Regions:
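Short hydrophobic/aromatic patch on the recognition helix
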Residues: 40-51
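N-terminal intrinsically disordered/low-complexity leader segments
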Residues: 1-10, 191-206
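Amphipathic alpha-helical segments used for helix-helix packing
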Residues: 98-124
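Amphipathic C-terminal alpha-helical segment
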Residues: 97, 157-175, 186-195
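Hydrophobic alpha-helical connector segments
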Residues: 60, 74-102, 143, 149, ...
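Amphipathic alpha-helical segments enriched in hydrophobic/aromatic and basic residues
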Residues: 23, 32-33, 44, 54, ...
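Amphipathic alpha-helical packing segments from all-alpha helical-bundle domains
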Residues: 70, 85, 118-143, 154, ...
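Basic, helix-initiating cap at the start of DNA-binding domains
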Residues: 1-26, 30-42, 56
Length: 206
């Protein structure tokens, strides 16, 4: 599990942040190194001093994004992993993240769609990102004492992925409301008895 944020020199972080944002919102092929340098407040020469090629920068951006995501989730669930409600909280977290990014989709999925043939390593990083999220679902289910935690975690991961894709297509949070309601049913099937308050919150979202 990626459970820390590595120390990065300030200029490296500025370049990674700028490039990650540009690649995510505009696509790899539409973003030039000049644009990245300008967005990072530096020069193209400096960018190349830190990253030998645009491809190397893309891979670094994906790894940077994955480490930051895992660090955020580790902190979010550090002291509250023994309630099935934490599983629903993961759905809430991803919905909030996508809203913040205006339902622009998943950076890993989008990069695989665009670059997996030209740069196969992006698929391996994306697979790792999806695997870590699935394993987190399984771990949360197991810590909560739910039945068949691995099966449940796999089912929830598919729900989460589907909601993410549909939210991009529909440009809406509606798929997450549906997924949250379906997740509640799955959790109940696997042994959770939610309180009336918890049921009310989920139905209200739905």
């Amino acid at each position: 599990m990626l459970d820390f944020k590595p120390h990065r020199p300030p200029t490296t972080s500025l370049i990674l942040d700028a490039a990650s944002d540009l690649f995510f919102h505009h696509g790899y092929g539409n973003v030039s190194m000049d644009w990245i340098a300008s967005a990072a407040g530096t020069t193209k020469v400096t960018v190349y001093q830190h990253f030998e090629s645009k491809e190397e920068l893309l891979l670094a951006c994906l790894h940077h994004r994955l480490v930051d995501r895992e660090s955020t989730l580790n902190a979010r669930f550090a002291e509250r992993t023994e309630s099935p409600a934490c599983v629903l909280d993961l759905f809430d977290w991803l919905e909030a993240s996508l809203k913040k990014n205006k339902f622009a989709g998943c950076a890993f999925t989008k990069t695989v769609n665009e670059m997996s043939e030209a740069l196969p390593e992006v698929r391996r990083i994306a697979q790792k990102a999806k695997r870590l999220l699935r394993e987190r679902m399984i771990a949360l289910a197991a810590a909560s004492g739910l039945q068949d935690a691995e099966e449940l975690g796999n089912e929830l991961a598919v729900l989460l992925e589907g909601a993410q894709v549909l939210s991009l297509i529909e440009h809406s949070a509606r798929p997450f409301r549906t997924a949250n309601h379906a997740a509640m049913k799955l959790l109940t099937f696997h042994g959770w008895t939610p309180s009336q308050e918890q049921m009310g919150v989920t139905l209200e979202k739905y």
